[in-house]
From Swiss-Prot:
Gene3D superfamilies (alphabetical): Nucleoid-associated protein YbaB-like domain
Its biological purpose: Binds to DNA and alters its conformation. May be involved in regulation of gene expression, nucleoid organization and DNA protection.
Species for this entry: Ligilactobacillus salivarius (strain UCC118) (Lactobacillus salivarius)
Identification of the protein by name: Nucleoid-associated protein LSL_1227
SUPFAM superfamilies for this protein: YbaB-like
Lineage, uppermost ranks: Bacteria, Bacillati, Bacillota, Bacilli, Lactobacillales
One GO CC term on file: bacterial nucleoid
Protein family membership: Belongs to the YbaB/EbfC family.
Length: 104
């Protein structure tokens, strides 16, 4: 009976450590800035790891009043580029935790 309590206490300590490490990794990921680019940097966007846009840069030559659709497409491409980088890094950083938890 005592042995079982020791195992449970040890398991709880491991879970607390895991939770602390997950939070640290998530905080670092959220603070990381990811850039998305389109058309030779005609449009560059910056996002934090928690998907908040912090900056957008549009080169003058990308602005054509007669072709608004092109600029919209460039912005979408840059945003999607940044989002895929965030998703990839999130999977690399946080995926290690779900691999160690049965059922996830």
């Amino acid at each position: 009976m005592m042995m079982r309590g020791m195992n449970m206490q040890s398991m709880m300590k491991q879970m607390q450590k895991l939770q602390k490490n997950m939070k640290k990794d998530q905080d670092e990921l959220n603070a990381t800035v990811f850039e998305g680019h389109a058309a030779d940097d005609a449009v560059v966007v910056k996002f934090t790891g928690d998907h908040k846009m912090t900056d957008i840069s549009i080169k003058e030559e990308a602005i054509d009043p007669d072709d608004v659709d092109m600029l919209q497409d460039l912005v979408l491409m840059a945003v999607n580029d940044a989002m895929s980088k965030i998703d990839k890094q999130t999977q690399e950083t946080m995926g290690k935790y779900s691999r160690n938890i049965p059922g996830l």
